[in-house]
Amino acid sequence: MFRPVSLLLACLALGLAGCATAPPEGAHAPNAPPAWTATNTVARPTPPVAPKYTLPPSTNVNHPAIQFNPLPATVVKSTPPAPVTTWSSLSRWAVAHQTGMPHRLTTSPVVSYAIGSSRGVLIVTIGSRDATWNGTAMHLGFAPEMVDDQVFVHGMDLAKNFEPLLCETPSLPKTNRIIVLDPGHGGREPGTISVLDGQPEKTFTLDWARRLAPLLEAKGWRVILTRTNDTEMAVTNRAIFSVAHHADLFISLHFNSSAPDRKQSGLETYCLTPTGMPSTLTRGYPDLWYQNYPVNAFDAESLQLAFRVHHSILRATGAEDRGVCRARFMGVLRGQRCPAVLIEGGYLSNPNEARLIENAAYRQKLAVAVAAALP
């Protein structure tokens, strides 16, 4: 993983202006194709050839408190804009958006540049999708390039990463705030299994959500859980549940696995990949770049939320930073009509992290960290 901590320290002195490897089969894969049809945009550059895959059997168990109806075939009312396919000079973009100018940080073969504003510092490396925002790892859609001694960045990254982070002030609801917490898995869907004693992920995610709920309520949030017991619920129904309750934010809680590899560790936070951008992780599913889902209307807000939560958990736990990531296969995020993220709070396949996750005090620490990230 890209860890340019020393680069960040160098950058701050400039005074600039203004999951992992594949888990056990089916660990977090969608239970079935989403109950809607994604809207195809008009521009279709040829993406990489995606591997063939087979979806697991469909599971569709209704929540006991609400009757679910399928989403309409088309959920995006207006046609989204065509994906950006151009590259732009980062210096010209900085002038146009009144940020600090990009500055080179190193003369080594790994050439990195920093660009900052009053909101923070973004560091990119030429030829790499790895980047950092205020010291927290992230992943670009496309690797920046050097052309005639200038840094060029893909237009999708400028629109979906640079602008939301460097130029836009994060906004969260201040009144009548509703947040839906989604404890991953449940019922016959255990999730991943602890390498220590075989305890299922579903038990730990539910406990995490139960600990988090009163902390958010104390801050004025109305908190609704997609499940409050060991109940099975299809990922598409979790999205429908959130929409039915008019959620302002949606946070799905999970733990990770790289079994049989026991070495992988750390924290990842996901939001859905913007239309027209390749994902950070696909887990073998086709990465259909040019499909548009309801939650893509909140790309900027989801990214900002992901960084708030991710940074807060890192600071509280000292976990390895695996970064804020983008994925398109996460069905629980696709149908959301509000900013939405999925947190992978550690690896149950790693003995050391599994030991922490099984400790109630550590799960309380995770809950406190998520609550601290929200106003």
Where are each of the predicted segments found?
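Primary recognition of N-terminal secretory signal peptides and signal-anchoring hydrophobic helices
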Residues: 22-200, 207, 212-215, 219
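Active-site-proximal helix/loop segments of hydrolytic enzymes
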Residues: 199-375
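C-terminal motif of bacterial Sec signal peptides marking the signal peptidase cleavage site
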Residues: 15-18
